Amino acid sequence: GLGDVYKRQDLIGKTPLVELGKYSASKGLETPVIAKVEFFNPGGSVKDRIALAMIEDAEQKGILKPGATIIEPTSGNTGVGLALVSAVKGYHLILTMPETMSVERRNLVKAYGAEVRLTSGKDGMPGAIKAAEELRDSIPGSVILGQFTNPANPAKHYATTGPEIWADTDGEIDIFVAGVGTGGTISGIAKYLKEQNPNVKVIAVAVSYTHL
């Protein structure tokens, strides 16, 4: 039978932890450094988690109807995750992004069936956001999921990524480090970890020109 054949969205999450032994040794660290291998997600990044979460949240709230159009301004991996989940669930996806984004990323989301609308590079993400809003206003029943402000983003990490890290380390975690884009990953995971142990130290890594 097909008992061991999974739908692609079922492969999102439950990623393994890998000990970075050589790195720890090179830095003379006594405590092991462990990485969560989020590129094992089918779309290749942690953003698969929130793509699935935001779409399912919109479905449950009745905001997103079957066969509707999803619109999202994105220059990163969220677009890949949304393209993957939209393809599986039968939604039309339009991604607005600055023309400065790589051709490889554009081709990847197109391979999943997404439509790409490029905006002026000099307008940056604000230009992509404006284009997305104009599209939403012109396409009946369309939805912008809004990863930067959508509570389903941190909630997904609180419900899944945080508990996975805690369980797989048997609670033996002193410091949690994460890169910051929307802030959803670090805030959701940190909330869960600190509820288990208030002494866990949380460190955010962000580029110098971050909006945070």
Task: Identify what each model region corresponds to.
Residues 4-212:
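PLP-dependent amino-acid enzyme catalytic core
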Residues 1:
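ABC transporter nucleotide-binding domains
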